[in-house]
Amino acid sequence: MDVTAKYELIGLMAYPIRHSLSPEMQNKALEKAGLPFTYMAFEVDNDTFPAAIEGLKALKMRGTGVSMPNKQLACEYVDELTPAAKLVGAINTIVNDDGYLRGYNTDGTGHIRAIKESGFDIKGKTMVLLGAGGASTAIGAQGAIEGLKEIKLFNRRDEFFDKALAFAQRVNENTDCVVTVTDLADQQAFAEALASADILTNGTKVGMKPLENESLVNDISLLHPGLLVTECVYNPHMTKLLQQAQQAGCKTIDGYGMLLWQGAEQFTLWTGKDFPLEYVKQVMGFGA
């Protein structure tokens, strides 16, 4: 790819960032489509995020992806949020239109799309959702919008717990889905929730390097063959949770599905063009 002065810059702001496949995926897509953009990753945490956004405006960047730990903070630095992003309380995509910043969340639409592409109908179903960070709440919000009957959210009593309660209130007030929030330490409640669940989704970083030997499911017997188990983590590709699920006879969806579909939507938001889906799946080795 020959980058010229006519090219516009798209970024990714996260910390850590070195594990991300997004730059490779997006640049392959941009090159295939023949579009004058280049995508670069920047190590940005909560402390440096405000300055990074000022830099985005000053450099007239087309936009940026936003990942951990900046997804919730980023909402404070855009001029407009989509209705879904307001419901989530976090964004993973910023589009810069001549200094006017719009915030979107494609994590939720991407993950739910991956579930649908597998042939699973979420309408009327119950999801056990692990975590209350930006990705997890995005999945929950989009699932609620698209027809989930109930979401049982489990999170440790950490800095995200109150945010989880606020998220549940927003979803309960604005959709027909019922969301409850429970401390993950309550293993009896967790076991009971899994017994009646249709979907288990890990929206945390547990399972991602260097936590690749960990899973929030301590007892594999809690998983049953009728359960669909889905992951947000894609590094490693086969997390411990997915290994447990396959051993228990569950159908699984790996983190590549969410990465692919959320990235496809981002691509269109930034460029106005269709994402070369089949090409990217092939060159990236995604089975989604």
From Swiss-Prot:
CDD domains: NAD_bind_Shikimate_DH. InterPro entries: Aminoacid_DH-like_N_sf (IPR046346), NAD(P)-bd_dom_sf (IPR036291), Quinate/Shikimate_DH (IPR022872), SDH_C (IPR041121), Shikimate_DH-bd_N (IPR013708), Shikimate_DH_fam (IPR022893). One of its GO terms (biological process) is aromatic amino acid family biosynthetic process. NAD(+) binds at A132, G133, G134, A135, N155, R156, R157, D158, K205, C232, V233, Y234, N235, G255. The keyword Aminoacyl-tRNA synthetase does not apply. Its EC number is 1.1.1.282. One of its GO terms (molecular function) is quinate 3-dehydrogenase (NADP+) activity. Coiled coil: none annotated. Keywords: Amino-acid biosynthesis, Aromatic amino acid biosynthesis, NAD, NADP, Oxidoreductase. Substrate binds at K71, D107. The keyword NAD applies. It is an enzyme of class 1 (oxidoreductase). Signal peptide: none annotated. HAMAP family: Shikimate_DH_AroE, Shikimate_DH_YdiB. This is Quinate/shikimate dehydrogenase. It comes from Escherichia coli O7:K1 (strain IAI39 / ExPEC).
